[in-house]
């Protein structure tokens, strides 16, 4: 049994698809759990805050992540505030528009340049009793000048991984 510690339906769907079918998966909605306050200063800290909180509330092993987009030209913003850039309802169309507006303001002709970015994911697994593990992954890439693709969620339509011409939003998960 494993609790996926997220209230983000896109994340839940993608994580479930990656796990073996013999693991009984629970979501935070199965326990009517709201997300804890993410007051960490890093993706790693926020990932662990969520995993510990949800594990303690459910008494299950919990896997939680914290992930986001870091854009070099914007001093690594939105960073740990990636979801919050979408406002109260985590509206990623709004967040993407905010990225484009900030880039327009910083470098008016940014669409003709390669804007370096990273996608960061910290993943924590927390066991009842206090044992935990946290790992961090980073994908280098750039920002697309337009939204492209409908696969995935979040910033996927504007993040182009290094070595690709397509956004995450255009690439099927493997």
Language model segments and positions:
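Anionic-ligand binding patches
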Residues: 1-3, 9-173
């Amino acid at each position: 049994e494993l609790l996926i510690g997220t209230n983000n339906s896109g994340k839940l769907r993608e994580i479930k698809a990656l796990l073996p079918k013999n693991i009984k998966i629970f979501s935070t909605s199965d326990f009517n759990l709201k997300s804890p306050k993410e007051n960490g200063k890093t993706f790693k800290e926020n990932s662990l805050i969520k995993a510990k909180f949800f594990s303690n509330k459910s008494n299950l092993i919990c896997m939680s992540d914290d992930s986001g987009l870091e854009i070099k030209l914007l001093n690594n913003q939105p960073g740990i505030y990636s979801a919050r850039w979408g406002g109260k309802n985590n509206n990623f169309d709004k967040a993407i528009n905010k990225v484009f507006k900030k880039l327009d303001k910083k470098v008016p002709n940014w669409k003709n340049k390669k804007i370096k970015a990273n996608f960061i994911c910290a993943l924590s697994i927390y066991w009842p009793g206090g044992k935990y593990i946290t790992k961090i992954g980073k994908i280098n890439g750039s920002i697309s000048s337009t939204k492209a693709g409908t696969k995935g969620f979040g910033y996927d339509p504007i993040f182009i991984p290094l070595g690709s011409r397509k956004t995450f939003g255009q690439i099927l998960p493997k």
